[in-house]
């Protein structure tokens, strides 16, 4: 609701749900996003030892329950860096893109491995790629880049 007050354009929300944590929140977060955001991108957020595709499926069910239409009003993009770039590509100049969930955190857990990750750096890298900036930071590595 606060984001809606910041723009006359669309609100594009990007977020995931951590593995082995708050399973009951997954559907709820996607339901709320389907109701309040214009577009939603579901992605990785510390899946740990859970299947990322299963986490995203649970979230997608919540979006669908509230009228979300896959590949029209919401998308699943496993790689968080590519998800950020995709959200930027969806945006028009007057839209707002919210990259939610990781905040100040400095890593992302896949399996039992913590990979260095910073949403701020990843967003700068995605913006650099989107805008064709030569000296933009490199996108941090995640194992989902290998798919």
Task: Label the model's feature ranges.
Residues 1-147:
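ATP-dependent carboxylate-amine ligase
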């Amino acid at each position: 609701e606060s984001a809606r007050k910041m723009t006359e354009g669309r609100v594009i929300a990007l977020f995931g749900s951590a593995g082995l944590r708050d399973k009951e929140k997954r559907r709820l977060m996607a339901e709320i996003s389907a109701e309040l955001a214009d577009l939603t991108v579901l992605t990785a957020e510390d899946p740990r030892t859970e299947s990322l595709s299963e986490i995203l499926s649970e979230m997608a069910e919540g979006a669908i329950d509230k009228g979300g239409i896959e590949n029209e009003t919401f998308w699943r993009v496993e790689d968080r860096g590519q998800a950020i770039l995709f959200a930027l590509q969806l945006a028009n100049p007057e839209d707002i893109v919210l990259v939610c969930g990781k905040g100040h955190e400095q890593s992302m857990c896949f399996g039992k491995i913590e990979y260095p990750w910073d949403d701020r750096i990843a967003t700068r890298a995605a913006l650099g790629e989107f805008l064709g900036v030569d000296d933009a930071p490199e996108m941090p590595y995640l194992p989902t880049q290998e798919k």
